[in-house]
Amino acid sequence: AIGPVADIDIDVVSLGMVDQSLLREMHEVSNVALQAMKGSDEYDFNANLRLVLWNQPDFMWLR
């Protein structure tokens, strides 16, 4: 994969989080974000993904 999805995989692996269900969940988040950014050149994918993850209880330790 190229683009944001590939970046997510790298970030997840670098954090030592290799759980497949988590990877799938993050891919789903990325796909939603990619759909939302269509037609908008100013959409900040990474900032929005961080905002999504920031508000997920399972990611509290990332703070």
UniProtKB/Swiss-Prot annotation:
pH dependence: Optimum pH is 4.4 with 2,6-dimethoxyphenol as substrate, and less than 2.7 with ABTS as substrate.
Annotated control of activity: Inhibited by sodium azide.
Recorded superkingdom: Eukaryota
Annotated localization: Secreted
GO biological process: lignin catabolic process
EC number: 1.10.3.2
Induction note: By copper ions.
GO cellular component, one term: extracellular region
Gene Ontology molecular functions: hydroquinone:oxygen oxidoreductase activity; metal ion binding
Temperature-dependence annotation: Optimum temperature is 55 degrees Celsius. Half-life at 70 degrees Celsius is 30 minutes.
Named cofactor requirement(s): Cu cation
Cofactor notes: Binds 4 Cu cations per monomer.
Known catalytic reactions: 4 hydroquinone + O2 = 4 benzosemiquinone + 2 H2O
Coiled coil (residue ranges): none
Keyword tags: Copper, Lignin degradation, Metal-binding, Oxidoreductase, Secreted
Family membership: Belongs to the multicopper oxidase family.
Additional record remark: On the 2D-gel the determined pI of this protein is: 4.05, its MW is: 75 kDa.
Subunit organization: Monomer.
Protein name listed in UniProt: Laccase-C1
